Structures are given as structure tokens and as C-alpha cells.
Amino acid sequence: MKDEQKQEIILYGYRDSLMLYDEGLSIDDIKEVLQLYEERELYLTCAGIKLAIDELIDKYGNDTFRN
């Protein structure tokens, strides 16, 4: 797999996670999504999801429930 393809998969996980957050999922919910991808060994997507989680925690804190 080419580096461009790998980067595209990582960005997919990142953007999709941010979209899920914008649609109302909590960071904990997104962590559960991450576990599902880890179980399926889709590690490039996991990398993107982890980037999004880290960014969301930095920006909003580690919310268990959305307000």
C-alpha cells in the first residue's frame, strides 16, 4: 500500500470521528468505536480515530456525557 493510501485511511478515521462528535457522540462513544476498529485490526483507521480523540480531549476535556 502506498503512503498516500495510508494517509487517506488515517484521515478517513480522523474526519469520521470528528463528524460523529459533531453529530452528538461523546468522546467515550468514539473510544468504543475505536475498540471496534482495533478488534478488526484496522490500525490505520485507528490512528486517525486516536488523533481525533486526542484533539477533542485537548479542546473540550474528557467528556463522559455530552451536554
Per-region residue spans from a language model:
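Boundary/linker segments of alpha-helical solenoid repeat arrays
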Residues: 59-64
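Hydrophobic/aromatic side-chain positions at a characteristic register within alpha-helices
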Residues: 38-41
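Short, charge-rich, low-complexity alpha-helical interaction segments
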Residues: 1-22
